[in-house]
Curated annotation (Swiss-Prot):
Gene Ontology biological process terms from the UniProt entry: cell division; mitotic nuclear bridge organization; regulation of mitotic nuclear envelope disassembly
Presence of the UniProt keyword Secreted in the record: no
Underlying gene: les1
Residues spanning the signal sequence: 1-21
Classification via InterPro entries: Ish1/Msc1-like (IPR018803)
Listed name of the protein: Nuclear bridge Ish domain protein les1
One Gene Ontology CC term in the entry: nuclear inner membrane
Physiological role: Inner nuclear envelope protein involved in nuclear fission, which is achieved via local disassembly of nuclear pores within the narrow bridge that links segregating daughter nuclei. Les1 restricts the process of local nuclear envelope breakdown to the bridge midzone to prevent the leakage of material from daughter nuclei during mitosis.
Length: 431
């Protein structure tokens, strides 16, 4: 009984498997028949063509794969790892491309702006006259007359609307002309009216080109006159040295100021030249000579110094002077005389006495006559009523400028500006 049972079971399983296989084959045959029905008019019915057609005719939903559920980033990484370029991923930019992109963008924008500007410029110049006529036509007669009076133009008589419009239009075009090319668009009547208004003689039978030449000649002359006016205004501006106190000094003071800085200058030079040279060399230091420190001393300090160091029967045993400047000159000659005779130790002591003394003597050592003399030589006003304190306060800025040049803050500003301009020139030349 048992072998028979096993045989029946095997036959039953074989029958079930055969039925399933027949079902699958029937399904494939039906799909092939359906697809074949769609391609019954195909030019070729070879096996390969039918297989390709059947494969292409399958529904995409039934072909599904694991990649359908992947996110975009995972798909891009998968393609990149396998050396496949993804159409959705932009190419990687190199550093040069990264920095070049803004420049390319700016260049494109600049080109667009230039083309737009040229287009609008041509359009505006072409329609300028139409626009002016349209604007002026909207004005009343009183507004046209007020515009002419305000801009210093003569109002035509009897002052009809046509005359007012023509006069205002001519005046506006005359003010708006910046290049002579715009004259070519004017009519003969407009050119003749403008030339007649400017009192320019027009030859009989003049052509349109002749009128344009006359108008250009007039505007060239007017342009030169305006440039001359600008030049005259510029020339009328105060000279730069007027900001410094040197413009008050006498010619002798200016010459001494330059010579103590080794600037060659003639005593016959005009005052304008002396002022320009003094202003140009205001920051030039004085020559480092020991006797130059005597220029700021009073007569009392000068005499004390000479009597103290007058040795060996010097020719300056009896010093006679009529002014402080003569005494300074005598003291400098004394220094030059002893410099060639004294020993190095004596000269060192003499120089120490010069450098240890203040550059400007104290107020108490100056006499009233000396203060007045110095103020007059520097072109400064003498206080009235006279006061030694006020006179010395007015004298100090001149003495310090004469000995040291401009103030410290002015020096810093000057050298800062000079250094900045030098760096700019060096940068321009390096381009």
């Amino acid at each position: 009984m048992q072998p028979r049972f096993l045989l029946h079971g095997a036959l039953l399983a074989l029958g079930i498997q055969l039925c399933l296989s027949i079902g699958k084959i029937t399904g494939h045959i039906s799909s092939i028949e359906a697809t074949a029905a769609d391609i019954h008019d195909a030019p070729s019915t070879t096996t390969k063509y039918v297989q390709r057609t059947v494969y292409a005719g399958r529904e995409k939903g039934k072909i599904g794969g694991p990649a359908d559920s992947w996110p975009q980033r995972k798909l891009d990484d998968f393609l990149q790892n396998h050396g496949v370029k993804s159409l959705d991923v932009p190419p990687i930019e190199t550093p040069s491309q990264f920095w070049r992109k803004p420049l390319q963008y700016v260049s494109k924008v600049t080109d667009k702006c230039k083309s737009f500007y040229e287009k609008e410029k041509n359009h505006a110049s072409h329609n300028a006259q139409k626009l002016d006529v349209w604007i002026f036509n909207s004005w009343t007669n009183s507004e046209l007359s007020r515009w002419l009076i305000k801009n210093k133009y003569e109002v035509p008589e009897p002052g009809t609307r046509e005359q007012l419009l023509e006069t205002v239009f001519q005046a506006s075009m005359g003010d708006a002309i910046s290049t002579n090319d715009e004259l070519e668009s004017w009519s003969n009547n407009l050119l003749l009216s403008m030339l007649d208004q400017k009192n320019i003689t027009v030859p009989i039978g003049a052509s349109h080109d002749d009128l344009i030449v006359l108008a250009r000649r007039y505007y060239d002359i007017e342009e030169r006159k305006s440039q001359d006016k600008v030049t005259n205004i510029t020339d009328s501006q105060p000279a730069p040295y007027m900001k410094e106190i040197i413009h008050l000094w006498s010619d002798g003071r200016l010459i001494d100021f330059l010579r103590e800085r080794n600037i060659p200058i003639s005593v016959l030079s005009p005052r304008e030249t002396l002022l320009k040279e003094a202003y140009a060399n205001r920051f030039t230091p004085r020559v480092m000579i020991a006797s130059n420190v005597l220029d700021g001393w009073s007569s009392e300090d000068l005499l004390d110094w000479i009597w103290k160091y007058n040795k060996r029967g010097s020719i300056f045993s009896h010093v006679a002077y009529n002014s402080r400047h003569e005494l300074i000159h005598a003291a400098k000659l004394f220094y030059m005389d002893v410099a060639s005779e004294w020993s190095s130790s004596d000269m060192a002591s003499l120089n120490d006495s010069l450098y240890s003394h203040p550059s400007v003597s104290k107020q108490s050592t100056w006499t009233e006559e000396e203060l007045k003399e110095e103020l007059e030589s520097f072109g400064e006003l003498v206080p009235v009523p006279f006061s030694s304190t006020k006179a010395f306060e007015r004298l100090l800025p001149h003495l310090y400028y004469y000995l040291r040049g401009p103030a410290f803050l002015n020096r810093i500003h000057y050298w800062q500006t000079f250094l900045g301009n030098s760096l700019k020139r060096a940068f321009v030349l390096s381009q």
